[in-house]
């Protein structure tokens, strides 16, 4: 069964039946409207975010499967902070603030794409991204929180999410 993979970035819940997607789907003999509808349904929980999607198409039967990836860490942090774009000057202009708990939940969501093995390391990675886009955490510079996480100040909070972290497949 010869399969073709189409890898694209789409706006969650807002895929349009235009180029470059439509011509590619048409060439493979797929109903563009139907695929777009299913893409919008599959990505609706990531509304407004860029989401990586893979469409696996069986060239013989025209059956297809949609695999939705996880949005970028930046996109998840921005959505959680309620802003649409990163700060152009993250050192001086802060665009939002998150709780450490929100950052932990994003780390858990991103686990399948991370190379880190521990929740603590994943959270520190998320904090690095938060710093680079101008988002504070617990009303502090994320760099300060990285130090506090390393010192064990948030071990109790991290322990609360350890089971959830361990349940996520890599």
Curated annotation (Swiss-Prot):
Return one GO MF term: structural constituent of ribosome
* A GO-annotated cellular component: large ribosomal subunit
Indicate yes or no for the key word rRNA-binding: yes
| Pfam families recorded | Ribosomal_L11, Ribosomal_L11_N
Q: Which UniProt keywords apply?
A: Ribonucleoprotein, Ribosomal protein, RNA-binding, rRNA-binding
Biological process terms in GO annotation: translation
Note the subunit structure: Part of the ribosomal stalk of the 50S ribosomal subunit. Interacts with L10 and the large rRNA to form the base of the stalk. L10 forms an elongated spine to which L12 dimers bind in a sequential fashion forming a multimeric L10(L12)X complex.
Homology family: Belongs to the universal ribosomal protein uL11 family.
> Any idea what this protein is called?
Large ribosomal subunit protein uL11
Naturally occurring in which organism (per UniProt): Saccharolobus islandicus (strain M.14.25 / Kamchatka #1) (Sulfolobus islandicus)
């Amino acid at each position: 069964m010869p399969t073709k993979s189409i890898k694209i970035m789409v706006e969650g819940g807002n895929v349009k039946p235009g180029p470059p997607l439509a011509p590619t789907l048409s060439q493979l003999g797929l109903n563009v409207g139907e695929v777009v509808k299913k893409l919008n349904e599959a990505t609706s929980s990531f509304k407004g975010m860029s989401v990586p999607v893979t469409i696996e198409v069986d060239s013989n039967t025209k059956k297809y499967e949609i695999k939705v990836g996880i949005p970028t860490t930046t996109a998840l942090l921005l959505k959680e902070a309620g802003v649409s774009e990163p700060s152009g000057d993250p050192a001086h202009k802060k665009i939002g603030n998150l709780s450490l708990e929100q950052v932990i939940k994003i780390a858990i969501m991103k686990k399948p794409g991370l190379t880190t093995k521990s929740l603590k390391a994943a959270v520190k990675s998320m904090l690095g991204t938060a710093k680079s886009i101008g988002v504070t955490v617990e009303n502090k510079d994320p760099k300060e929180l990285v130090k506090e996480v390393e010192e064990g100040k948030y071990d109790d909070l991290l322990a609360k999410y350890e089971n959830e972290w361990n349940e996520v497949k890599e």
